[in-house]
Amino acid sequence: MTLRIGVIGTGAIGRDHMRRINQTLSGAKVTAVSDVNIESVRTARADLAPEAEVVGSGEEVAASAGVDAVVVTSWGATHEQYVLAAIAAGKPVFCEKPLSTTAAGAGRIVEAETAFGRRLVQVGFMRRYDAGYRMLKAVVENEIGRPLMVHAAHRNPSVPEQYITPMAIQDTLIHEIDVLRWLLDDDYVSAQVISPRRTRHAHARVEDPQIVLLETKSGIRIDVEIFVNCRYGYDIQCQVVGEEGLASLPDPMAVVMRKDAKLQSAIMTDWKDRFIDSYDLELQDFIKAAARGTASGPTAWDGYVAAVSSDACVEAQSRPGSIVPISLPARPPLYN
């Protein structure tokens, strides 16, 4: 049986997922699309899913009899309403991050899914599907003893004028917030943000670089450098220091060239290229689970924890040097 998917939001990532579903992955096809920009949705349909129905709203996509599962790739502030609509319709839903722009909104999704009684939500934290992170997790769990510290970095070549300081947490660090929690199997208890010397390449509305300091329940200390105007490329680094050794995230495979008295290899500049395989794997995982009427991968609870942690980090940005506590309620049994 081919899973019929409705896509809500036909911007860049929505179009990417439509292409994946119809041209790269197996077991599914796009049968309905919706976007507030009618020209965007018509173009996406014509280019990528000519047999799909153009539907008037995201809620109508979720309720459609011609849709078995939903993919939400709309503007972040609308994610909550569309995920809740999918849950109300009893349909599996893949939601790009953030699950909600607020912790309260993510909490409402957790409550709705818990009341439904079965997992339906997968959140688009694709780094969990990256081969490098999976290799690193295996080493952390089996080879280097108890983790003590983590040193990480998230660097972008540049960001546009509309990228402002809180987005360094909400759009950038959010990936580290999730993947490091998964890597260490440990929740956060506090956050602190400090700002080193400011780069001259940052525009007026963004503080750059920033260093985020996190502590986990077991006492692991994490420092994450966020540098979104590093100029030289898109660079993700992660090193875990354990009692018996340390382990580092491998860099993407690249040819090493010796030429003109130089030893060099290329560094990627586009985040989509860095994690392209992960996007394919996470969506194929969703299709496989949705065909059984459920969801796998990162949960609504993971999305909620990320939102709570993100809110604490944003608060810490506004109180430089202050340590902000991170408090979570008990995890619902559905997510154990």
From Swiss-Prot:
Its EC number is 1.1.1.18. It comes from the Bacteria. Keywords: NAD, Oxidoreductase. GO terms for biological process: inositol catabolic process. The keyword Oxidoreductase applies. GO terms for molecular function: inositol 2-dehydrogenase (NAD+) activity; nucleotide binding. It catalyses: myo-inositol + NAD(+) = scyllo-inosose + NADH + H(+). It is an enzyme of class 1 (oxidoreductase). InterPro entries: Gfo-Idh-MocA_inositol_DH, Gfo/Idh/MocA-like_OxRdtase_C, Gfo/Idh/MocA-like_OxRdtase_N, MI/DCI_dehydrogenase, NAD(P)-bd_dom_sf. Homotetramer. Involved in the oxidation of myo-inositol (MI) to 2-keto-myo-inositol (2KMI or 2-inosose). Belongs to the Gfo/Idh/MocA family. This is Inositol 2-dehydrogenase. It comes from Acidiphilium cryptum (strain JF-5).
